[in-house]
Amino acid sequence: PVLPGIKVMPGLPVLSFMHWILAILIIAVIHEFSHGIYARLYKVKVKSSGFALFGPILAAFVEPDEKQISKKSKKVQLAVFSAGPFSNILTGFLFIAVMTFITLPLQAAVFVPDGITVNGLLDDYPMQSTNAEIPFIINQFNDHEIKDFNDFSNATLDLKPGDNAIVGTNKGEFSIVAAQNPENSSKGFIGVSNFALNRAPNEEIVSKYGSFVPPAVDWIHMLFFWLWVVSWGVG
């Protein structure tokens, strides 16, 4: 079930209450009124339509005349009943397009890379022995500043087994001795996994437009993300 505050599945963010309410409302309106439009198209009377309130949830409904629709051909019945799910699938593609061409580019403009978030440590490897508490953000590796994945890859490119290294994080510095890479014995390995790019608000954008802009862009992007997920789930 797609419910606020619950981890739906690994890899998906937690759904906020406001995103849930808005996503359900928008998708319900698209779904139900598509039934109504197709009913009118095939001259089936719509007995009632409107909005309903289920606790905090605002929903939409359309009620075609069952007697009239039962007299129509199977093709017409199928068209009317499938209009809602089909519309949800189509608008799902629209939401993907909005994310691809609008909200993701906006996120790239209002945020800047600011280190690598580590969410996992591998057993019996150097970083685990430091007792570093995950998650943590790597922002320095020896003399290299780490802003993104390329920085981290370049900083560890020449690391050999047995090399000493200083890993700078938001939770302090850790001194380690590189282990042997399990996939390439000539390469050093520190034993971190499950990376994510950490982001910080773009100070130029913040100073020009205000500190509310980056979180607002994130919020809007997540709305379209959940509209897409729920649309295809319903469709």
What are these regions (language model features)?
Residues 1-235:
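Hydrophobic transmembrane alpha-helices and their immediate loop junctions
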